[in-house]
Regions:
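Extended, charge-rich alpha-helical interface modules
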Residues: 2-127, 144
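Conserved dinucleotide-binding and phosphotransfer motif residues
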Residues: 53, 149, 262
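Conserved N-terminal Rossmann-fold NAD(P)-binding element of oxidoreductases
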Residues: 130-133
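Hydrophobic/small residue at the entry helix of a nucleotide-binding pocket
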Residues: 137-138
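NAD(P)-binding Rossmann-fold cofactor-contacting core
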Residues: 141, 147-165
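Rossmann-fold NAD(P) dinucleotide-binding segment
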Residues: 165-168, 173-214
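Rossmann-fold dinucleotide-binding core
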Residues: 207-210, 214-265, 269-271, 275-278
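An accessory alpha-helical subdomain
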Residues: 268-401
């Protein structure tokens, strides 16, 4: 039977001894790391505590604004704060862009908190609001907004139209929020029941024709509104509402003040300018997105497979396409087919695509580059702004996904 050879004791420089030394070093490193991590945890706890202190002060700011009917959004104050924090970051050796990103998030949460508080604020005590078409998405949204602020809210829909006279009695504001194709008919129908001093407004995505009908139907204050957000919006903070004047701006001002108090940004425009711009901002953009999605579907493209190969910008663009098709098609058909002017605009867009066929068929790279350069010059400084903003969005997308 063979005898086992005894193992020699570890000698300095041999594997066994160096392993023991490495173990000692590793333990020391872990202890050092543990101490540093405890320091970081303590600092993080202080940061959270300070943010809680800040939020309590924000609550007092909200209460003060609420008592004096001041708007939540104060852009000059926010930009001044960001500028000072960037300077402080530079002086202390921190990246100012990093600090700006943190503070924009903090400021946003502060505004949302203030907006939540201001949602309970009414600029017209004991006001009565009638929502015409109040059972739709936006009708339900505004119903919640006005009720939270203490207004008496009445709903007028198809089912209770016989009660129109009693529902209109004593109201301060009527908001018409019905499909575009019936908005003018509804406006004409409700006009005779409006109290003389009540404000009549609509919230459709076209303004020229409904505004004209409201001015005919009601002799009192008239204003056109277009909320550029949907019923799933969680907060009115910095949400845009376009206001197109109709009659007696002073009498209508309290309506705009109410939305501003809730955190919205009111943009003023005449009806024609609004409709021209919305043709591009909404109709053309939604139709182009629809066409892209339709093309992908017809080519039977595997969306999941393309995402495996995708750049962040493609994921962002595909996300916008998917977002469109996750919503109500009737809403977008109303926007796209709202007027003959919009349909003509979209036909011009399709024609402009056909004009590029010859360039593609001939493989004319020079023409493409010339057109590209012309468009670059036309975009001007916005090109650099777009690059910065889209880079920020891409970075956020990478962080999250």
């Amino acid at each position: 039977m063979e005898r086992e050879n005894p193992q020699p004791p570890p000698v300095e420089g041999k594997a066994g001894f160096s392993g023991t030394k490495d173990g000692i070093q590793s333990s020391a490193v872990e202890q050092a790391l543990s101490g540093l991590r405890q320091d970081i945890d303590a600092i993080d706890a202080q940061i959270v505590s300070l943010l809680a202190d800040r939020q309590r002060v924000v609550g007092r700011v909200a209460a003060l604004k609420k008592s004096h009917n001041l708007a939540v959004y104060h852009p000059a104050r926010e930009e001044d704060l960001i500028s000072r924090r960037r300077q402080q970051a530079t002086h202390t050796g921190l990246n100012p862009d990093f600090i700006e990103e943190i503070y924009r998030t903090i400021i946003r949460r502060s505004r949302v908190a203030q907006t939540g508080s201001m949602a309970l604020k009414s600029v017209r005590s004991d006001g009565i609001v009638l929502l015409v078409g109040g059972k739709g998405g936006m009708g339900c949204y505004f119903q919640a907004c006005f009720r939270r602020a203490g207004y008496q809210v009445r709903i007028l829909d198809k089912e209770n139209w016989p009660e129109v006279q009693s529902l209109c009695d004593g109201i301060d504001l009527a908001i018409v929020g019905v499909p575009i194709d019936v908005s003018c008919e509804v406006i004409r129908s409700i006009g005779p029941f409006m109290p003389a001093k009540a404000v009549l407004c609509d919230i459709t995505s076209i303004k020229e024709q409904p505004l004209e009908e409201m001015l005919k139907a009601h002799a009192g204050p008239v204003i056109g509104l277009h909320p550029l957000f949907g019923p799933t919006t969680s907060s009115l903070d910095k949400q845009i509402i376009v206001a197109t004047p109709g009659r007696d701006d002073n009498a209508c001002q309290w309506v705009l003040d109410q939305f501003a108090t809730w955190g919205a940004v009111v943009v003023r425009s005449d009806a024609r300018e609004h409709d021209d711009i919305m043709g591009i901002v909404q109709a053309l953009r939604h139709f182009a997105t629809f066409a892209f999605g339709q093309f992908l579907k017809r080519r039977k493209i595997s969306l999941s497979r393309t995402l495996e190969f995708s750049s962040p910008i493609y994921r962002l663009e595909l996300g916008m396409v998917g977002r469109l098709f996750a919503q109500d098609p009737s809403l977008y058909s109303e926007i796209i087919f709202a007027s003959e002017a919009r349909r003509n605009l979209l036909k011009d867009y399709i024609q402009s695509l056909h004009e590029n066929l010859e360039m593609l068929e001939n493989g004319n790279k020079c023409l493409f580059q010339k057109e590209f350069q012309k468009i670059t010059e036309w975009f001007g400084p916005f090109g650099e702004q777009a690059m910065r903003e889209s880079t920020f969005l891409i970075d956020k997308l990478i962080e999250r996904f």
